[in-house]
Amino acid sequence: PASHHDFGKNIIPANIERSRVFAFPFKDENRKRDAYWRDVGTLDAYYDANMDLVSIDPQLNLYDSAWPIRTHQPNLPPPKFVFGTQGDGERTGAAIDSIVCSGTIVSGGRVQHSVLGPSVRVNSYAHVSDSILFEGVQVGRHARIRRAIIDKHVQIPAGFEIGYDLEKDRARGFTISPGGIVTIAKTEDLSAVSASESLTSALSEGGIRQPFLHRSNPGVPNAGTRSQDTT
């Protein structure tokens, strides 16, 4: 429980104490850069490391065949981008300056400068920018996400906004990093948050009336009410 699960603070020191540890100088004089190492122990550092991946010349080039990434490859189809309706420029499935993993479908939504994990779904008219979406995240129609980290399988309701009003996000109980990155945990039920906000908005605007009955004449039932059957 006392561990931060951090390489520098916990993992490497613990291994040095109980095992024989050897250092390897990851440096190749024939390469233009030293080997990649980056501390991602904070939300802001993790966010910056991911945003670097989508830059034109990232420090860690995932597409460098001379330095392959050995990892599990899920058995999923390639990403798909659908809807490019003429005359409706907003409904165009597109991803720009982004990394999109297998199984993801951008269906009439727009993704900019973001990293999308496997099996993400971005629905029509939604806009995702400068964000990291983990596996299985579902983004509803007209939703807007900016400078956020969304954990696995979170469902973003239609029209929901994240990252556009930090005070509102903070009031929702979301974690916000010192750099202003909004983080949504996989346990968050955003549908309940959306429903609560919609109800509060309707009440403040007088759009919902209290369900009570009023009779101006005790002898005559009001229109729309049901009188008791005495037969």
Predicted features along the sequence, with ranges:
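Left-handed beta-helix
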Residues: 1-231
